[in-house]
Amino acid sequence: MHSPKSFLLLAVVFVALRVTAAPLWNAKNPEQLQYIAARCMEEWSPKAKDPKAALKNWMEWKLQPSNEEATQCYTKCMLENIGYYEPGEKRLKGVRVMQQWETFNRYQSADRNKVHDLTDTFDFIKPLKSSSCSDVFNAYKDVHAKHLETIKAILFCDGKSAEKYYKDKGKNVKQKGESIFVHCEEIHYPVGSPQRNELCKVRKYELGTGKPFENLMECIFKGVRYFNDKNELNIDEIARDFTQVGKKPDAVKAAMENCKSKTKETDPGKKAVEYYKCLLADSKVKKDFMEAFDYREIRSKDYYAQITGKLKPYSASDVRKEVNDIDSNKCV
């Protein structure tokens, strides 16, 4: 017969194995949620039969038209990127619903009991047969209809919760209408700091020095998602920025694959600087990268600008003028 101590040890080992096996996940703040929603809409609305109608529905939290692949895949995109659907397990993750609420409930209006109900509903759904858009959508659609008020609340779409969050966090998070670049500069090159004198040349694609520059590049690379959650280089995201300005991404993909294979750095800041140097050192890439990076700065002010029609058709001269205006404010 096992002793109580041995049962306790087995229980601890079992829990440890479960924790180790489970993918790491962090609750999502308003900036992250807006980024996810905008990207999923950008990806799937063009594939709808009526893109404008689909976008209008999705922005109003209506998963319609429900029989279209675009809506089903948009739904899966949202659930998977937020982390409420885990493809490795083929199931909805109730524990993450609770973690989201526990992390941010001081800002939100969600009722605790209703959050528990939503958590239980997720957990009672058995693992799916596949991670296809239709299977994920069909597993989730009734949950969405029944618990929409709670879902919106824990995802900062309940009125003023996002506003409370942004006010509380201040300059520590990217504010609405602020570019990722300016946000990172204000943290790592603040007014009055010794490194502030370097900011003007840094904004003109010259390399900065020391830890402040490493911190700045890490912040920007994370903000524009050139780094993923594990601080690994996301070459597809860099390539996407090239296509946004009408440039072929083949050269930059090859250059960054080569750079990635040679980089030995593990510190995220030093690694970001190494990758940035690679982008500026390759004569086949540098000019197009600078153009793409400028445009990314402008687009990072408003994640919804492209899908709402607020983003003007791309013009290199117009973007350069906007960036020059920002430079003029920073170089004083």
Curated annotation (Swiss-Prot):
Disulfide bonds join 40-77, 73-133, 184-219, 200-331, 259-278. Antibodies against the protein are found in the serum of individuals exposed to Aedes albopictus bites. Modulates blood feeding of female mosquitoes on vertebrate species by binding and sequestering different mediators involved in the host response, such as biogenic amines and eicosanoids. Binds dopamine, serotonin, histamine, tryptamine, adrenaline, noradrenaline, leukotriene B4, leukotriene C4, leukotriene D4, leukotriene E4 and U-46619, a stable analog of thromboxane A2. Inhibits platelet aggregation induced by serotonin and low doses of thromboxane A2 analog U-46619 but not by high doses of U-46619, collagen or ADP. Prevents leukocyte recruitment. Noradrenaline binds at residues 185, 203, 294, 297. Keywords: Disulfide bond, Hemostasis impairing toxin, Platelet aggregation inhibiting toxin, Secreted, Signal, Toxin. Its main location: secreted. It comes from Aedes albopictus (Asian tiger mosquito). This is Long form salivary protein D7L1. Belongs to the PBP/GOBP family. The gene is D7L1. The keyword Secreted applies. The keyword Disulfide bond applies. InterPro entries: PBP/GOBP, PBP_GOBP_sf. One of its GO terms (biological process) is sensory perception of smell. It comes from the Eukaryota. Residues 1-21 form the signal peptide.
